Amino acid sequence: MAVSSLVVGISDCKVTRDANSVLVTYALGSCIAVAMHDPVSKVSGLLHYMLPESAIDSKKAAQNPFMFADTGIPSMLDALKAAGGDGKRMIVRLAGGAQVLDSQGVFQIGKRNYLAARRILWKAGMLIAGEAVGGDVSRTTRLEVSTGRQWVREAGGVERELVRNSAGAKRTEQA
């Protein structure tokens, strides 16, 4: 069977259990991609959010919860559970959070996005198994639904797999 790519746009989330699918999102600058995979049910999801907190625009958050970390991550978890996933089994990885448009570091959207994800996941009792965050380059990431393997490619770089070690999280880069 042919593998199909499910493209996750900005302020978007896709959840699937189709083993022939790969979830992919492009051009992660300061945005964050949250990838989750349940190795038992094979339910996977990929969220691409723009901003850390919905309080800045509750109307937009109501229209599209995937725009913000604080509304997008819980909405993603609800969708994963509805598809048969178990939050306690989820392998979670992050990519993005770069400082690409704010060279002076005034707004630090990438860092704030990353910290929001960590806080929300921690409150949900979920550990981050791998991440490629920070820096000043954009990234593309893809999640293979059948295996839960995830790859990241930085602009101008080679694709590499985000791996999970036995102790839990393995950092590939830091914010």
Which residues are covered by each model-predicted region?
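Short acidic-hydrophobic catalytic motif
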Residues: 1-31, 38-61, 65-91, 98-175
